[in-house]
């Protein structure tokens, strides 16, 4: 991880580096369960599910986290983890913990995308809905589908 001046200042003040007003980081991570795990004993698959659920619970405590099944829609992935945070370091820390966990070798990650939302320079602050557009999501929505 490279360090820029903003990150250095955040370490001095103890305040986490954040995207700034009206910006959020959005991470789309597609995973596939390894064939060896899929063909292995049911107990091993159940243990993988429990450990992954525990990691996802920790992610949800720190940032907006949703999972979506891609079974039947993509041949190269099984599920998507969608994370939204004001703090990019938080996303990186979570992914580092996943890669350091015992389940890392059981998952393949064929696709991984990072984006950043940004308030439009054309938005009208006098418009009734303007304050609600400052963040991507703050309602913790539970839509069944997410199109990437």
Protein language model features and the residues they cover:
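Short S/T/G/P-rich N-terminal loop/turn motif that feeds into the first structured element of a domain
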Residues: 1-60, 86-90, 113-148
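Short amphipathic alpha-helices in soluble, non-transmembrane regions
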Residues: 93-101
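Short, glycine- and small/hydrophobic-rich beta-strand elements in well-ordered beta-sheets
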Residues: 56-77, 104-116
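Short, charge-rich binding segments
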Residues: 72-73, 90, 103-105, 138-140
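Conserved, mostly hydrophobic/aromatic
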Residues: 81
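Serine-centered coil/turn micro-motif
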Residues: 36, 101-102
């Amino acid at each position: 991880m490279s360090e820029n001046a903003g990150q250095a200042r955040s370490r001095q003040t103890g305040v986490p580096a954040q995207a700034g007003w009206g910006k959020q980081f959005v991470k789309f991570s597609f995973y596939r369960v390894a064939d060896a795990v899929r063909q292995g004993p049911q107990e091993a698959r159940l243990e993988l599910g429990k450990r992954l659920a525990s990691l996802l619970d920790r992610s949800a405590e720190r940032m907006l986290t949703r999972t979506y099944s891609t079974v039947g829609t993509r041949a190269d992935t099984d599920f998507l983890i969608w994370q939204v945070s004001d703090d990019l370091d938080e996303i990186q820390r979570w992914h580092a913990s996943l890669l350091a966990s015992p389940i890392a070798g059981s998952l393949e990650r064929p696709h991984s995308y990072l984006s950043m939302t940004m308030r439009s320079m054309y938005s009208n602050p006098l418009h009734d809905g303007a304050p609600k557009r400052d963040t991507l999501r703050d309602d913790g929505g539970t839509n069944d589908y997410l199109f990437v």
